[in-house]
Amino acid sequence: MSDNNQALKDAGLKVTLPRLKILEVLQQPDCQHISAEDLYKKLIDLGEEIGLATVYRVLNQFDDAGIVTRHHFEGGKSVFELSTQHHHDHLVCLDCGEVIEFSDDIIEERQKEIAAAYNVQLTNHSLYLYGKCGDGSCKGNPDAHKRKN
């Protein structure tokens, strides 16, 4: 927990119990790409008494401080993930809503080439690919979007 205390201090935020609890939940492997509402439900399941308004406020503070990255996927709901992860892009299934993270060196290099062709030096980028399940089997099937090769 002291690492989280230091992370909050390094980000210029006061260490409070709600911030610590929210950060702990965000660090759980099953809490990547989590909405404020789902994070709130997770906190309730853990017996934490943190209001939904506080969850929204803390997530906005974390976003401003660079602790989390906010994504606006199809459907209008914001989801959050810790910013400490390596760069990756996202593939979103419009049928089931699953968000798949991927990295591809060829795509990364091509984006740099395109920017250079327009005399722009990239500082950051986001790539979101949207699609539908190839065979319609994804709803209720946790293995539907496993990488095939």
From Swiss-Prot:
Q: What organism is the protein native to?
A: Vibrio vulnificus (strain CMCP6)
Q: Name one GO biological process term.
A: negative regulation of siderophore biosynthetic process
The protein here is known as Ferric uptake regulation protein
Query: Record's InterPro entries?
Result: FUR (IPR002481), Fur_C (IPR043135), WH-like_DNA-bd_sf (IPR036388), WH_DNA-bd_sf (IPR036390)
Q: Which GO terms describe its molecular function?
A: DNA-binding transcription activator activity; DNA-binding transcription repressor activity; sequence-specific DNA binding; transcription cis-regulatory region binding; zinc ion binding
Gene Ontology cellular component list = cytosol; protein-DNA complex
Q: What subcellular compartments does it reside in?
A: Cytoplasm
On subunit structure and binding partners, the annotation says: Homodimer.
Which family does the record assign?
Belongs to the Fur family.
Specify which residues bind Zn(2+) according to the UniProt entry for this protein.
H33, E81, H90, C93, C96, E101
| Stretch list, region Dimerization | 85-142
Q: What is its main location?
A: cytoplasm
